[in-house]
Regions:
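Structural signal for the C-terminal ends of transmembrane alpha-helices
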Residues: 1, 105-115, 175-182
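Hydrophobic, glycine- and aromatic-enriched re-entrant/interface helices and adjoining loop segments
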Residues: 3-96, 120-122
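Loop-to-helix entry and N-terminal half of a specific, functionally important transmembrane alpha helix
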Residues: 112-152, 158
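A juxtamembrane structural motif centered on a specific transmembrane helix
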Residues: 140-187
Length: 187
């Protein structure tokens, strides 16, 4: 416990020093995270509209292509990092839980493939890739819900973006390749 307390004290003392090295847009991003209502038409607009859209989805959502915040252009760039906002508005709490369940199954299967793999590289890759997918999902959903600052983290498989989609598909291809390689060793 004394290590945690001493680490916390060092962090508190060092924070003002590190803040002096931040660029103005980085400082604005941090300030917007703590108080988005301070600039509701500027830096805080995206996160405020995101929270409104997620909340307006309610329990069962508004229906496919019937989201008001998203399709009346209150939510800019909804197809990129804020795709979860659009999904939550259209499919509600039930759809969001369903999406989390699908992602959980995907991560479980990736970790499972790593656990049965006999190749050390495949094992490490699957564990690392499963963790990476989990972190991207957690950061994106936390960002959309206002629990973390907006950092531009895509939601795997759903967000619009060529490089993110390509990297995700290559990673899933390596995972599937390790599964096929495992089957060939057994057979």
């Amino acid at each position: 416990i004394k290590y945690f307390i001493s680490s916390f004290i060092v962090l508190v003392i060092a924070t003002p020093f590190f803040i002096s090295f931040l660029k103005p847009y980085q400082k604005l991003r941090i300030l917007t995270f703590f108080d988005p209502e301070k600039d509701p038409l500027g830096a805080g607009y995206q996160i405020i509209q995101s929270k409104i859209a997620v909340g307006s989805g309610g329990f069962s959502g508004k229906g496919f292509l019937k989201g008001t915040q998203s399709y009346l252009d209150f939510l800019p760039e909804k197809h990129t990092d804020f795709i979860f906002t659009l999904f939550s508005e259209e499919f509600g709490f039930i759809g969001s839980i369903g999406l989390l369940l699908v992602y959980s199954i995907l991560i479980y299967r990736i970790i499972y493939i790593g656990s049965i793999s006999r190749n050390f590289f495949s094992k490490l890759f699957c564990y690392g890739y499963g963790s990476s997918i989990f972190i991207y999902i957690a950061v994106n959903m936390s960002m959309v819900l206002g629990l973390l600052p907006i950092v531009g983290s895509p939601l795997p498989i759903m967000s619009y973006g060529g490089s993110s989609m390509l990297a995700t598909m290559v990673g899933l291809g390596v995972v599937l390749s390790s599964k096929i390689y495992h089957r060939q060793i057994i057979a």
